[in-house]
């Protein structure tokens, strides 16, 4: 067993910068052996540190390379200086093809018996991933009492014009029990999601989202969305769902579009609490048409105490550059918190 303090001091004196995380490794013990002949190499190591244990087996034959690695309660949180992360137990097998010193293709699969995050231990996760030089594909499944899901995704043309596809089947998701959020108390979520994107930058990206069979259940409430479809292009956003539809046309910045929409609400409902003064912080210029027939999702999912028994219709145009807002809002009868409002148009 050797201390790394002296190594750290020498490297510092030589002005060789190490990643900050390396300094969290205080003690290290390494056992290993390597043999090779011709194009065949076998290397086995057992690494023990103050943060945990890693065992690996690397084999190279010609241009092919394989890796088997396992960890037992490796303290990744301490290694990465992340207070939310705890320990990780991992088993992984990987294989790849080399071209010179560059890996041209690689695939890996493994299981995660346990991972601690925010004082919750996730169990029974499995994954696989593959990369062929242009496309990455991967799958993840978790079978845990408080999160049961299957994810699958791919990303193609990563260096040129990325195209991604993603699907998720979430059979059970309990945010409070996972210590992620207390917003919905003991609620359980389930849904099916698929999404795709095309484009290199958010401002020029085209994307689609499909949600099916969304279910929310808690001790006091239940809510479901059978279908939700969203399509996004550089000059248009269109959303169709059980609870209504929204269509936006024109120039918009996804990061500031919320400010512009709140500006519409502030102009038409200046006394409504919870809406700050409009801040013109962008160059958004668009028209908005929306028809909302069900507001229960606003109350339950967004946590906003807004309710209307009648349809809400909005027709608006906004130009942040000229600081102009024209809006026609039909909001006959609604409540916000304990206050009742009428003729909000």
Language-model features: locations:
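Interface amphipathic segments
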Residues: 1-345
């Amino acid at each position: 067993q050797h201390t790394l303090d002296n190594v750290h001091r020498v490297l510092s004196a030589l002005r060789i910068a190490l990643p900050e995380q390396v300094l969290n490794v205080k003690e290290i013990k390494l056992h290993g052996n390597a043999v090779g002949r011709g194009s065949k190499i076998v290397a086995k190591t057992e690494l023990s540190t103050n943060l945990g244990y890693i065992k690996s087996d690397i084999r190279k034959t010609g241009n092919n390379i394989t890796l088997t690695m396992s960890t037992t309660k490796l303290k990744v949180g301490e290694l990465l200086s992340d207070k939310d992360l705890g320990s990780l137990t991992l088993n992984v097998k990987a294989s790849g093809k080399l071209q010179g010193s560059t890996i041209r293709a690689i695939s890996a699969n493994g299981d995660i018996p346990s991972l601690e995050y925010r004082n919750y231990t996730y169990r029974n996760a499995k994954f696989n991933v593959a990369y062929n030089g242009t496309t990455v594909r991967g799958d993840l499944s978790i079978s845990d009492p408080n999160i049961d899901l299957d994810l699958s995704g791919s990303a193609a043309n990563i260096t040129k014009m990325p195209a991604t596809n993603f699907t998720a089947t979430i059979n059970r998701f309990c945010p409070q029990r996972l210590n992620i959020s207390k917003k919905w108390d003991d609620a359980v979520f389930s849904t099916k999601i698929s999404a795709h994107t095309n484009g290199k930058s958010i401002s020029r990206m085209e994307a689609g989202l499909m949600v099916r069979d969304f279910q929310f259940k808690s001790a006091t409430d239940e809510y479901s969305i059978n279908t939700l479809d969203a399509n996004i292009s550089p000059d248009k956003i269109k959303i169709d769902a059980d609870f209504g539809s929204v269509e936006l046309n024109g120039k918009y910045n996804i990061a500031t579009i919320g400010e512009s929409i709140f500006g519409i609400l502030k102009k038409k409902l200046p006394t409504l609490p919870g809406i700050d003064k409009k801040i013109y912080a962008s160059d958004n210029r668009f028209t908005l048409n929306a028809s909302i027939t069900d507001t229960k999702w606003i109350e339950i999912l967004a946590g906003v105490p807004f309710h209307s028994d009648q349809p809400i219709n909005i027709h608006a145009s906004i130009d942040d550059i000229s600081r102009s807002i024209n809006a026609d809002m039909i909001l006959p009868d609604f409540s916000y918190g304990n206050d009742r409002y009428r003729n909000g148009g």
